[in-house]
């Protein structure tokens, strides 16, 4: 690739960034009503433009099949009439959510007489890099608009036509509501250099949110000069304590693994206290077998689940995203927590127990973005948490942690109210 070509891409991304920065200022100043009007207008535009979106998507699907892409990826790319309608409905749902922008908390009087508090404000410009799912274009744009942020979207090259078609409707809807169309921009090139330029532009982009495979996220985390909201893996654990109710334990373990296999909040390792193993594991093993799940277990697990195969050290760190589960029998609570500390990716962990003291210890001692008691890890989701929608999940400790909804797309500034006060 020529230096001239790379320079052209960098200049294009720089121009997009400048336009986003200017639009972001206008969005931040806009009122809740204007942003909600924009979301409603975009939803209407997507419905009215559904045939154009479907045609663009059909071209992407044809190219993907000709290129021999994985059928599962092609399925994620497809925009059926129902999925297109779901994009519009999702935007209306976002419009109905409470607006975090401008909310003031902890306003209190100080001994000097001033009042000090914190006001929630948009972050500014959010870059979102994602793969295969073109519906993310509308979902992510909607969350950013509602929270008063401009956004730059860089979708997967395999869905470039679909993303452009959706972006046209988003721009038109923003302008219908009197807001700048540059508030949402899609990077129009499929060149990988565009990603490199976007993540190294702190003067125009305030944060990057990568949504995709581990390789993509690792590259962005390694190369970015802009803060990144991310998670790499979802190695989630369920620990069945000796004080667990057997019926609850079996139901939670089976649901956490089988309700949906390919998600980041699916359980990948099951830990069982040795005092509970004989009454829990045979039934768990039977139901997992019926669901087509391969169990990779320690020696004590294999003694209780006939179909289990030996687990290796690698299994304890693997996010399978498929019909495989690692199972280990542990001495008890402390052993389980030690295993989680060593192998967890920091996403979601759950304990099944009827012991209130142990449940409280688990909540305090396990340092993951979501920690649960007597509930399936599959609940680690913005919709289930009452956020309405999420831009992604973060396993970092700064700035947002866990499911990132509207509030996670804002920041706080200090506000001070006085009446002629001067400092003595």
UniProtKB/Swiss-Prot annotation:
One of its GO terms (biological process) is L-proline biosynthetic process. PANTHER family: DELTA-1-PYRROLINE-5-CARBOXYLATE SYNTHASE, GLUTAMATE SEMIALDEHYDE DEHYDROGENASE. Its main location: cytoplasm. Disulfide bonds: none annotated. Catalyzes the NADPH-dependent reduction of L-glutamate 5-phosphate into L-glutamate 5-semialdehyde and phosphate. The product spontaneously undergoes cyclization to form 1-pyrroline-5-carboxylate. Keywords: Amino-acid biosynthesis, Cytoplasm, NADP, Oxidoreductase, Proline biosynthesis. Belongs to the gamma-glutamyl phosphate reductase family. It catalyses: L-glutamate 5-semialdehyde + phosphate + NADP(+) = L-glutamyl 5-phosphate + NADPH + H(+). Pathway: Amino-acid biosynthesis; L-proline biosynthesis; L-glutamate 5-semialdehyde from L-glutamate: step 2/2. It comes from Halorhodospira halophila (strain DSM 244 / SL1) (Ectothiorhodospira halophila (strain DSM 244 / SL1)). The gene is proA. SUPFAM superfamilies: ALDH-like. It is found in: Cytoplasm. The keyword Nucleus does not apply. This is Gamma-glutamyl phosphate reductase. NCBIfam families: PRK00197.1, proA. GO terms for molecular function: glutamate-5-semialdehyde dehydrogenase activity; NADP binding.
């Amino acid at each position: 690739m020529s230096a001239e070509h790379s320079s052209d891409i960098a200049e294009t991304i720089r121009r997009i960034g400048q336009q986003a920065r200017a639009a972001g200022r206008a969005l931040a100043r806009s009122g809740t009503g204007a942003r909600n009007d924009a979301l409603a207008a975009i939803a209407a535009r997507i419905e009215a433009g559904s045939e154009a979106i479907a045609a663009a998507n059909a071209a992407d699907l044809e190219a993907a099949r000709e290129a021999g892409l994985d059928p599962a990826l092609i399925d994620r790319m497809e925009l059926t009439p129902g999925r297109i309608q779901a994009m519009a409905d999702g935007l209306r749902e976002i419009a109905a959510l409470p607006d975090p922008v401008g909310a003031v908390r902890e306003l209190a009087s100080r001994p000097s007489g001033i009042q000090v508090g914190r006001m929630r404000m948009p972050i500014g410009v959010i870059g979102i890099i994602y793969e295969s799912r073109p519906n993310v274009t509308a979902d992510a744009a909607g969350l950013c608009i509602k929270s008063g942020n401009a956004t730059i979207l860089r979708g997967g090259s395999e869905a470039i036509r679909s993303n452009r078609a959706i972006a046209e409707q988003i721009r038109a809807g923003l302008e219908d509501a009197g807001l700048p169309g540059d508030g949402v921009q899609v990077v129009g090139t499929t060149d990988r250099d565009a990603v490199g330029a976007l993540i190294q532009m702190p003067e125009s982009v305030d944060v990057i949110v990568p949504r995709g495979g581990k390789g993509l996220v690792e590259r962005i985390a390694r190369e970015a000069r802009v803060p990144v909201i991310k998670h790499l893996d979802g190695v989630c654990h369920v620990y069945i304590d000796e004080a667990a109710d057997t019926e609850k334990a079996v139901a939670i373990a089976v649901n956490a693994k089988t309700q949906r296999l390919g998600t980041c909040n699916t359980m990948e390792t099951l830990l069982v206290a040795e005092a509970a193993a004989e009454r829990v594991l045979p039934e768990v093993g039977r139901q997992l077998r019926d669901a087509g799940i391969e169990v990779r277990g320690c020696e004590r697990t294999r003694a209780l689940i006939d179909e289990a195969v030996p687990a290796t050290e690698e299994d304890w760190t693997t996010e399978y995203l498929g019909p495989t589960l690692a199972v280990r029998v542990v001495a008890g609570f402390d052993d389980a927590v030690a295993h989680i500390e060593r192998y967890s990716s920091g996403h979601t962990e759950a304990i099944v127990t009827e012991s209130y003291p142990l449940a409280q210890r688990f909540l305090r001692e396990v340092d993951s973005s979501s920690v649960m008691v007597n509930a399936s890890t599959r609940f680690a989701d913005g919709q289930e948490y009452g956020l309405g929608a999420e831009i992604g999940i973060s396993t970092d400790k700064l700035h947002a942690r866990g499911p990132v909804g509207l509030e996670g797309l804002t920041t706080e500034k200090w506000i001070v109210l006085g009446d002629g006060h001067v400092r003595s």
